[in-house]
Amino acid sequence: LGLHRLKQQGALMPQKERLSVIGSEQHRALARKAADKFVTLVKDTRNYLPIRPDEHRRIRLFFLSGDGKVIAGKLMKDDSHKVKEHFIQALEKEGFIVEESEQTEKGKMEEFKKKYDLCLVVINLIGFAQYNTIRMKWKQPVEQPWYVSEVPTVFVSLNFTNHLIDIPMAKAYINAYVNS
C-alpha cells in the first residue's frame, strides 16, 4: 500500500485544518439522507405494508434491546430507551395508538387479537466491530413472537442485517441499519 511512503511525505493523515469538516452539519445532513434512503424491505409476504392509522390504528410495540455495546473492552450503555420513545412519539404523531409494556404473561389469543390491529417488533441490538453477528435473546419466553400467525406483525431491525435467522416466522421484515 505504500503507507510508509505516504507517512514520510506527510500525506498519510490530512492536515489538521482539513479535519474540521468531520462532524460538520453538511456531513450530518449526508448521513441523515443516507439513513433515510437505504432502508431495505427484506420481505412482506402478507402485504402488511404500508401500515396506516385507518387500518392498523392500535399497535402493540415490542422493543428488543441489548445490554449495550463494548468499545475498547468497556461496556457502554446504549440509548434504547430514547430510541423506543422516539418510535412511540413518531407513531402517535401519525395517528396510531401505541401500547408498549413488558409482557409477563401471554393471555388469551382472542383477547389479544381484539385489542391490537398490528404488532411492531423493533430490534435495537447494538454491537461493535468485534461482533459480526448479534443473536436475538428474548428476556422471557412470553416475549417470543407467538402472535405472528394471528395478528399482522412487522419486524424492524435497527442495526444488524441478519436478525431474520432468529425470526424465520416473520412475514414482514425491514432492515433500517441505524436507530436514528
Positions of PLM-derived features:
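Preference for extracellular/luminal or secreted protein segments
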Residues: 1-180
